[in-house]
């Protein structure tokens, strides 16, 4: 990426764009905002003037019941009742405006403000997402993403539907795709993180379905009562217009209309279902609601699958950790005993190689560097101090040698306090070919004025050869390594190298950590059960059971922690 100061300033300005207070909507939809207490209209889109045949300024201050009929307002009140702030919810359909045209009304509440979004009602019957959900369930985890792309295309009619997963560096990769031939395939291509800036990702978490009916639409500005203390927060408005940079991005891609459906796993944005069309395309509120439900169901399947894999992996690693502890327990010379448990210790963590540096000696297993490389890793770790964990996925960070194939990433944890003993974990180099949708080092172009950036104009596949790095170390990897360290320190507590440093070490820290993690998994399971909605009575019984188990685990963690 360019290091030009003007380019960086423009790029920073793009990343800081306050798109949640953009102050305009996409027509032909209309936005009305009124105060929950008092019912006074405090904001309205400019095109409301045409719908209600009055000046938009004349709408401000009017009681909402004089503008919207009571039956539709009752549906709005029901839709927002007892709900926390969140995305607009389809309230119903009613006659609106001077000529009583049929409009779908969606609504959400934000504090004392109620947002009503009105869209012309379609005469077509809304899709049945039930068959799509069954199709996802019948394909199993391996076929889920392709089935999701196909079912979204069937429900929405978009030319290209891609399932796009975010990776550790913020970039995204297209893992599945459904095409009808009007747009080119992007399957297998990767997009740089800068394509979706942080503030946009935050909004994807808040509002799970977003549609742009026409990238060339003229936004309708929102007028608001000057007494409102701040610009109107439009985070949850489905009609909210889009950053001009994003619209230009879509036009450069040859896309005339788009829609995105968020995939959320463990409370984080896992990815998107990105839908593109070769010509403008309206998606009615009923269809968006069906696609929202389908996206949430797919998210639940992904979340459950990830949780199941995590539990299975950690159970296997815990068994290996227990094996290490059992074999070292009671040995007169635990250091000598370590030679026989290094393979089990390696299996207890997510690494390709392990080195224990004890009393100036190296004990190693798996894929590790030569002696000189181990010394280089130790120097790198010592320079970062013994008070924290040090890790890197880049071989050049710690190893000056050219050959880092067998040991590229390193995670270093000090053993004991006040001594030079270390636990080193290594990961092999991951050489790979990445196909980018356009050059990742040229994600933007500076406009002629030099004041703003525009998106790139080419999305042609560009090949990059990646080497010199391993799979990155995640927080979970560090936690597993720390647990192994506890086991090793406990076993070595009576040896000369660590004497006096670990007299208080016992099994409690590991037990407390595992109890807290079991509790966290139960909370996540409860969230998945909420999503499954098996029936109120059954769900309440499940929650009571989970709460009881969680209390027991919490007591264990509190006692042992």
Where are these regions (language model features)?
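Active-site-adjacent "gating/activation" loops or surface patches in catalytic cores
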Residues: 208-254
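Conserved oxyanion/phosphate-binding beta-strand-loop segments in alpha/beta enzyme cores
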Residues: 108-125, 206-224
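Sensory/regulatory domains in signal-transduction proteins
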Residues: 25-125, 159, 170-173, 177, ...
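Bateman (tandem CBS) regulatory domains
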Residues: 128-134, 228-232, 317-325
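Terminal helices and disordered tails flanking the catalytic cores of nucleotide-processing hydrolases
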Residues: 1-15, 321-334, 340-459, 472
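Signal-transducing coiled-coil/dimerization helices and immediately adjacent hinge/linker segments
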Residues: 21, 29, 136-162, 166-167, ...
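Regulatory loop-to-helix N-cap segments in sensory/regulatory domains
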Residues: 237-241, 276-292, 424-426, 430-480, ...
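GAF sensory/regulatory domain recognition
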Residues: 166-222, 357-379, 387
């Amino acid at each position: 990426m360019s290091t030009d100061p003007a380019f960086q300033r423009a790029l920073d300005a793009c990343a800081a764009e306050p798109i949640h207070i953009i102050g305009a909507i996409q027509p032909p939809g209309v936005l009305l905002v009124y105060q929950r207490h008092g019912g006074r209209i405090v904001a309205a889109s400019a095109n409301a003037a045409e719908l209600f045949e009055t000046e938009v300024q004349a709408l401000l201050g009017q009681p909402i019941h004089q503008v919207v009929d009571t039956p539709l307002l009752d549906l709005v009140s029901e839709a927002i009742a007892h709900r926390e702030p969140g995305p607009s919810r389809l309230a119903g359909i009613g006659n609106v405006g001077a000529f009583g045209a049929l409009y779908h009304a969606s609504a959400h509440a934000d504090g004392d403000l109620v947002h009503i979004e009105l869209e012309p009602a379609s005469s077509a019957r809304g899709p049945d997402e039930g068959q799509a959900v069954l199709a996802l369930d019948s394909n199993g985890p391996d076929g889920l993403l392709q089935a999701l792309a196909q079912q979204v295309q069937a429900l929405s009619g978009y030319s290209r539907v891609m399932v796009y997963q975010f990776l550790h560096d913020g970039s995204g990769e297209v893992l599945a795709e459904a095409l009808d031939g009007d747009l080119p395939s992007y399957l297998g291509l990767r997009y740089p993180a800068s394509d979706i800036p942080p503030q946009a990702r935050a909004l994807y978490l808040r509002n799970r379905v977003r549609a742009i009916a026409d990238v060339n639409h003229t936004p309708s500005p929102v007028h608001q009562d000057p007494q409102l203390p701040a610009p109107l927060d439009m985070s949850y408005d489905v009609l909210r217009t889009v950053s001009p940079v994003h619209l230009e991005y879509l036009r450069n891609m040859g896309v005339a209309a788009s829609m995105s459906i968020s995939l959320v796993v463990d409370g984080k944005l896992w990815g998107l279902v990105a839908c593109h069309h070769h010509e403008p395309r309206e998606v009615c509120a009923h269809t968006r609601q069906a696609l929202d439900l389908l996206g949430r169901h797919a998210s639940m399947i992904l979340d459950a699958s990830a949780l199941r894999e995590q539990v299975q992996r950690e159970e296997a690693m815990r068994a290996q950790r227990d094996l290490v502890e059992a074999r070292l327990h009671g040995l007169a010379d635990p250091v000598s005993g370590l030679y026989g448990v290094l393979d089990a210790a390696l299996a207890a963590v997510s690494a390709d190689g392990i080195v224990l540096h004890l009393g100036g000696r190296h004990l190693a297993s798996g894929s590790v560097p030569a002696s000189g490389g181990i010394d280089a890793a130790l120097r790198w770790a010592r320079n970062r101090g013994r008070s924290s964990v040090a890790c890197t996925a880049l071989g050049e960070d710690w190893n000056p040698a050219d050959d880092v194939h067998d040991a590229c990433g390193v995670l270093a944890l000090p053993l004991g306090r006040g001594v030079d003993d270390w636990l080193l974990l290594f990961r092999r180099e991951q050489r790979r070919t990445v196909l980018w949708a356009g050059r990742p080092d040229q994600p933007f172009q500076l406009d002629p004025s030099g004041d703003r950036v525009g998106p790139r104009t080419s999305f042609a596949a560009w090949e990059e050869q990646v080497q010199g790095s391993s799979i990155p170390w995640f927080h979970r990897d560090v936690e597993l390594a720390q647990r192994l360290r506890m086991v090793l320190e406990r076993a070595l507590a009576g040896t000369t190298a660590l004497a006096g440093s670990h007299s208080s070490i016992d099994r409690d820290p590991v037990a407390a950590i595992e109890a807290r993690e079991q509790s966290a998994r139960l909370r996540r399971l409860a969230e998945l059960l909420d999503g499954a909605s098996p029936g109120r009575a059954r769900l309440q019984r499940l929650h009571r059971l989970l709460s009881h188990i969680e209390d027991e685990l919490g007591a264990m963690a509190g006692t042992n922690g």
